[in-house]
A protein has these predicted regions:
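Active-site phosphate/ATP/adenylate-binding loop shared across adenylate-forming ligases
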Residues: 1-29, 34-51, 55-237
Length: 240
């Protein structure tokens, strides 16, 4: 594979520089984020019920809206799962991350809007690579593939409207990833989103052996299982 790291460096440098500017004014960047969220919240049923108009200061917002745990939001999330619009975020949400349900005995469903995926999860991954290249400028990390290990969609909830998917956070991240990232990513989306781990594991190992893997991303315990399987399934590992 052609080493695309030099082509990616200008973008990575820009991302790193932006994050450093934000670190120089942490309070200001947090206030700006709050303002953006309040402007969106003013367009929702949750915000209107609390008199949010998008212009509140932090002190006014904190006084009006006390801190709350997930259970306080469960009724609103269930409305969103049924397809209701403008509940906790403007528009409809069709992706949800499902917790294991170990706390309180009930699964939690976390709405994943396009804005949250882009502004939080994907932005965080981009900054991780940008920071790595800043500290390791001679790296050829984009000269091969990023092995991204993801989960799957469970969709265990009955009566979901068409198009709604519920499952592991990583499944939504892979499903909605920028197509350009697929240049550097293994395995294929079809393999990455497989539900049956017994069928998925050998496919993951095979994909890793056929690629020049330069970085890995995923839940450590899951990845440990994959890495342990490599020498079991193959007598030697030869990367192209």
């Amino acid at each position: 594979m052609i080493n695309l790291t030099p082509l990616c460096k200008p973008l990575m440098h820009a991302i790193y520089a932006r994050e450093q500017r934000l670190r120089g004014d942490v309070e200001g960047s947090q206030r700006a984020t709050l303002r953006r969220l309040l402007r969106q919240g003013a367009r929702t049923a949750w915000g209107r019920a609390r008199g949010i108009d998008g212009s509140e200061s932090y002190a006014a917002f904190a006084a009006r809206v006390p801190a709350a745990g997930y259970e306080a939001f469960r009724p609103e999330v269930e409305r969103m799962l049924r397809g209701e619009r403008d509940v906790l975020w403007p528009g409809r949400c069709d992706r949800y991350a499902q917790s294991s349900g170990t706390s309180g005995g009930k699964s939690k469903y976390i709405p994943l809007t396009p804005q949250s995926l882009q502004g939080c999860h994907y932005a965080g991954a981009a900054y991780a690579f940008a920071s790595y290249l800043h500290h390791h400028p001679d790296s050829r990390v984009f000269g091969g593939c990023n092995f991204i290990l993801g989960g799957s969609y469970a969709n265990e909830i009955a009566g979901l409207r068409p198009g709604v998917k519920v499952g592991d956070l990583s499944a939504s991240l892979i499903d909605r990833i920028n197509p350009l990232v697929n240049i550097f990513r293994i395995p294929s989306k079809q393999v990455a989103l497989m539900e049956d781990w017994r069928q998925k594991l050998p496919r993951l190992v095979e994909a890793s052996l056929r690629a020049d893997v330069r970085s890995i991303s995923g839940v450590p315990s899951w990845f440990l299982t994959v890495l342990r399987e490599v020498p079991v399934s193959y007598t030697h590992l030869t990367l192209p």
